[in-house]
């Protein structure tokens, strides 16, 4: 049986980091049907299934030596929020996912959940055991403001556990469950605290309200409900 949990009002506000867009080059299709922006060491490749509803923005990746990959994987991988029309970089993301159309990072994933108006996006960058980055980005012209959602949600989830079970857990947003952000900034998702390589998992359905005032995003956890781990 699902058990509803009372959640104290938790508010997290950050100074809006507004990064001026850094221009690259126009994005064009490559031989694998993906979009590549720029050339040489400055080249970036759009990550599949991360393009905004407006088709104006997307997540992309680049390496310190461009997009060439081999064995070992490319060094210095960065994930980015870009504008597709001119390849402008609006923000640096927190993950290290890469994919060329032929190969991709093993046990990494990068997921985007866009608002219907394409002005806001949620980043989920998962590695094998953790969500390395779980963040909200608000686009305003040539700048993007970032809000760290993991820093908000994980402590609230941890506080729900008995004290003896609060240590040694990994935090991960479940990308196999619905992850939605509506036009009013209401975010819904499922996350878990679990012990790697064990069957111990504490899963929660979470609702967070996000708002932006004066270019500064803030958020609050409005509900958290324990659910069965699948």
Question: Language model features by range: what are they?
Answer:
Residues 1-4:
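Positively charged n-region of N-terminal signal peptides that target proteins for export
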Residues 14-21:
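C-terminal segment of classical bacterial N-terminal signal peptides
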Residues 24-51, 133, 141-230:
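Acidic, small-residue rich beta-repeat scaffolds with periodic aromatic anchors
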Residues 47-113:
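Short N-terminal edge-element motif at the start of the domain
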Residues 61-65, 71-72, 123-128, 190-194:
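Beta-strand C-termini and the immediately following turn/loop, strongest in propeller blades
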Residues 71-77, 127-132, 199-203:
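Short, solvent-exposed loop/turn segments at conserved positions within beta-propeller repeat blades
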Residues 116-117:
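Residue-level detector of Asp-centered blade-edge/turn motifs that repeat once per structural unit
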């Amino acid at each position: 049986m699902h058990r509803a949990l009372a959640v104290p009002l938790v508010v997290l506000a950050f100074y809006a980091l507004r990064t001026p867009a850094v221009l690259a080059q126009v994005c064009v299709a490559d031989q694998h049907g993906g979009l590549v922006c720029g050339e040489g060491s400055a080249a970036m490749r759009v990550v599949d299934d991360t393009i905004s509803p407006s088709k104006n923005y997307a997540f992309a990746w680049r390496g310190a030596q461009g997009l060439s990959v081999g064995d070992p994987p490319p060094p210095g991988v960065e994930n980015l929020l870009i504008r597709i029309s001119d390849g402008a970089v609006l923000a640096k993301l927190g993950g290290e996912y890469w994919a060329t159309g032929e190969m991709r990072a093993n046990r990494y994933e990068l997921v985007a959940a866009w608002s219907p108006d394409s002005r806001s996006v949620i980043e989920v960058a998962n590695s094998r055991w953790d969500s390395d980055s779980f963040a909200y980005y608000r686009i305003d012209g040539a700048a993007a403001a970032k809000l760290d959602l993991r820093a908000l949600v994980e402590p609230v989830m941890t506080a729900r556990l008995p004290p003896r079970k609060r240590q040694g857990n990994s935090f991960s947003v479940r990308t196999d469950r619905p992850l939605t952000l509506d036009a009013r900034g209401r975010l819904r998702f499922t996350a878990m605290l679990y012990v790697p390589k064990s069957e111990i998992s504490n899963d929660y359905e979470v609702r967070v309200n996000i708002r932006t005032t004066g270019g500064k995003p803030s958020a609050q956890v409005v509900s958290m409900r324990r659910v069965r781990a699948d």
